[in-house]
Amino acid sequence: GEQLCRLRAEFQASRYLTEERRTALARELRLNEAQIKIWFQNKRAKIKKASGVKNALALY
């Protein structure tokens, strides 16, 4: 729903959240910070997997 749309929009703006941003989002969406952190980690992993990157270090 609305939370998911907000998370996706935030992810499009930046794949990595600052601690301040994560805290603000958690408050705004009434989720805990761990949930948001994990959602972002999973989203990054899905994109990496979809792009066929075999070695995570290849991105750096």
From Swiss-Prot:
Belongs to the engrailed homeobox family. This is Homeobox protein engrailed-like. Residues 1-41 bind DNA. Pfam families: Homeodomain. It is found in: Nucleus. Keywords: Developmental protein, DNA-binding, Homeobox, Nucleus. SMART domains: HOX. Disulfide bonds: none annotated. One of its GO terms (cellular component) is nucleus. One of its GO terms (biological process) is neuron differentiation. GO terms for molecular function: DNA-binding transcription factor activity, RNA polymerase II-specific; RNA polymerase II cis-regulatory region sequence-specific DNA binding.
